[in-house]
C-alpha cells in the first residue's frame, strides 16, 4: 500500500533525504517484542522500509524483515514514543494523538485474545505486547495528561471523538476526517508555537 501512496501523492524525497531534521520510525520486533527506533540516514536499508514496518498492522500484515528481523507496527510495543524522547533528553516534546483528551482503550475481549494467541503463540514476547497494549496505552495517556498539565509537553489532539475505524473504506468519511484534522491542526499552531518559544 505504501508503494501505491508514493505513486499517487507527490513527495519530495530529495529534500526529505537531505533535510537536517532527525526523523525516526518506530517498529516492533516480532521476535523480542521490543520497539526499534530507526533513524533516517542511519540504516542499512531504505528508510521507507522502516516506515512500512512501522505501519504494518498485526493480524492484517506480513511482518517486514529489516536486517534479518521481522517487524510490525511500532504501536504494539510503543504506542507513543514519549518515554524514549524523554530518555533521549529532548527538552521540547510535541505529541500528536489520534484520540481526544480523556480517551482510554477498553481491554480486549476473549475473542481478540484467542485471535492473538492463534496468530502469535509461537512469538511469546510479541504476544505479551499484544495482550497488554491497552493497559500500556492507558497508562501512557495518564502520563501524557500529567506532563501536559505541568507544561513539560504539548499535546495536539482531536477536539471530538473519531467515529470511524482503522479499516474504513468510505472515501468521503476519510476525506471529511482528513479535512477536520487539517483544520484542527492549523488551529493548534499558536498553542504549539507558544510552547516551543517558552
Stretch-by-stretch model annotation:
Residues 1-198:
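Patatin-like phospholipase
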Amino acid at each position: 500500500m505504501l508503494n501505491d501512496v508514493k505513486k499517487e501523492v507527490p513527495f519530495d524525497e530529495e529534500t526529505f533525504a537531505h533535510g537536517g531534521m532527525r526523523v525516526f520510525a518506530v517498529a516492533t520486533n516480532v521476535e523480542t517484542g521490543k520497539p526499534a527506533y530507526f533513524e533516517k540516514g542511519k540504516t542499512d536499508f531504505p528508510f521507507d522500509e522502516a516506515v512500512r514496518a512501522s505501519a504494518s498492522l498485526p493480524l492484517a500484515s506480513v511482518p517486514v524483515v529489516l536486517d534479518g528481523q521481522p517487524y510490525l507496527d511500532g504501536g504494539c510495543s510503543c504506542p507513543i514514543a514519549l518515554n524514549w524522547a524523554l530518555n533521549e533528553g529532548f527538552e521540547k516534546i510535541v505529541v500528536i494523538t489520534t484520540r481526544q483528551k480523556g480517551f482510554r482503550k477498553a481491554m480486549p475481549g476473549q475473542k481478540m485474545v484467542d485471535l492473538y494467541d492463534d496468530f502469535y503463540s509461537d512469538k511469546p514476547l510479541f504476544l505479551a505486547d499484544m495482550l497488554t497494549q491497552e493497559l500500556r496505552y492507558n497508562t501512557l495517556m495518564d502520563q501524557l495528561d500529567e506532563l501536559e498539565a505541568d507544561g513539560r509537553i504539548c499535546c495536539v489532539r482531536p477536539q471530538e471523538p473519531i467515529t470511524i475505524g482503522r479499516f474504513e473504506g468510505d472515501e468521503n468519511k476519510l476525506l471529511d476526517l482528513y479535512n477536520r484534522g487539517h483544520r484542527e491542526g492549523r488551529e493548534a499552531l499558536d498553542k504549539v508555537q507558544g510552547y516551543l518559544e517558552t
